[in-house]
Amino acid sequence: MSKMASSIFATFSLLSSLLPTSLASSDANYEDFLQCLDLYSQNSIPVYTRNTSSYTSILESTIKNLVFLSPTTPKPNFIVTPMQESHVQTSVICCRMHGLQMRIRSGGHDFEGLSYVSNVPFVVLDLIHLKTINVDIEENSAWVQTGATIGELYYRIAEKVGVHAFPAGLCPTVGVGGHISGAGYGVLMRKYGVSADHVIDARIVNVDGEILDRESMGEDLFWAIRGGGGASFGVILAWKIRLVPVPPTVTIFIVPKTLEEGATALLHKWQFIGDNVHEDLFIGLSMRSVIISPKGDKTILVSFIGLFLGGSDKLVQHMEQSFPELGVKPHDCIEMSWIKSTVVFGVFSNDASLSVLLDRKNPFPPKSYHKVKSDYVTEPLPISVLEGICHRFLKNGVNKAEIIMSPYGGRMNEISESEIAFPHRKGNLYKINYIAEWEEAGSMENHLSWIRELYRYMTPYVSKSPRSSYLNFKDIDLGQTKNGTATYSQAKAWGSKYFKNNFKRLMQVKTKVDPNNFFCNEQGIPPFSS
């Protein structure tokens, strides 16, 4: 940063305590906001107003949930797409100066739209251009900017060497900013834990417009942004991550079973196996309904999805010893490189090229109307409960619902609940993701009622005190406050579910680094009242 820029930011820091503590007055002078961006930046910052021809296309470009593309959805006053770190600093400064709330978007996969929707005057800070990835194989690490996608990260790692990986999710278009700050599940979780377990440094812009790294932010804030949701504390610019070793060959399998083929009994058996098999083996599953006749008759399809860090011969041996009922045979297994497996799981095609990982317009999964929820299971579900789930999936009018179950065990059981802000560790058998999708806006209420009724049905059979949820499967039904003005007791409604006993410490960190709650949203971490 030049001396002039440094002086500007220093001046702002001195004046920051004089800025208003509340956001978004109705008489905010938005022209002054644009002038502020020019004043505090030495080069032009891309900014789009509602009168800009490309405003709508940029706003909608990464929105995955069609629920938030309706004409009645509140739209930002401005979209800022920073090209460099100083643009982020300037944006924070000018939003604070001119009473505009900031929503921070990296990949646009926020299930509740909180990264790009607000009910007060606001700016979307779209980090899509901050996507540089520098891989250092000698150090087994990489710096990845927050606007990069998981697919891009995977591709750049494999470009350097074929026996390193990073434990993260399946969908290649998810942005690393939100994914890692919310924890980051994937098929390597039993071997290596979640993405946030492998963050060794970070760069963040704080409420005063300063860029901090791990040393300058301190260990409390560094702890909080690993699993606690970075958007409550600042703007994550980049993560330094530790890479993990993988063998040259991994093996995958996908074994589908219908109700008629004994899917319910196999699912029940899986509950006693998934968290106990060797940590090199991940066996997850997906449950959905499928139409099997022209008359619309349906059945349930349960797909058992496996990844093994090794060859198919050894995988088949493991399966014969631990889960012979599933009947995995050599012809069910496909050997490939780890990077190829990310393509297969990411787009469910064995024919797609590796370059699909770089395609931000990848149509899989397609944009849709959807609602999600999550649970953690600590005791195996009885057969009768699984049958009750199946019965609900066969309900008419709900054809695109899905449940995904991800097993625990292995490394997930070895890390303390308080090691990072993400708390869901030992004691869980598996995590459940519930997903309801629909194709027409008019079907929303039917599908919302369906998923909420299923969630209520599951109440006696999942984790308790609190009933836990996964932050990256954000669920506004857990509770919210408008404009991020929650008290401790209000925020505990969702905070205890996402963060368990770590919630109070997260609020303590928030109170220290952002006492006036500039970085806020409907389910953010609020500060303790002064």
Curated annotation (Swiss-Prot):
Top-level division of the source organism's lineage: Eukaryota
UniProt cross-references to Pfam families, sorted A to Z: BBE, FAD_binding_4
Keyword annotations: Disulfide bond, FAD, Flavoprotein, Glycoprotein, Nucleotide-binding, Oxidoreductase, Signal, Thioether bond
Cysteine disulfide links: C36-C94
Matching InterPro entries: BBE, FAD-bd_PCMH, FAD-bd_PCMH-like_sf, FAD-bd_PCMH_sub1, FAD-bd_PCMH_sub2, Oxid_FAD_bind_N
GO MF annotations in UniProt: FAD binding; tetrahydroberberine oxidase activity
Signal sequence residues: 1-24
Annotated crosslink 6-(S-cysteinyl)-8alpha-(pros-histidyl)-FAD (His-Cys) location: H109-C171
pH relationship of activity: Optimum pH is 8.9.
Glycosylation sites: N51, N483
Function: Catalyzes the oxidation of different tetrahydroprotoberberines, such as (S)-canadine, (S)-scoulerine and (S)-corypalmine. Catalyzes the oxidation of (S)-coreximine and (S)-tetrahydropalmatine. Catalyzes the oxidation of different 1-benzylisoquinoline alkaloids, such as (S)-norreticuline, (S)-nororientaline, (S)-coclaurine and (S)-norisoorientaline. Exhibits strict specificity for the (S)-enantiomer of tetrahydroprotoberbirines and 1-benzylisoquinoline alkaloids.
Protein name: Tetrahydroberberine oxidase
Organism: Berberis wilsoniae
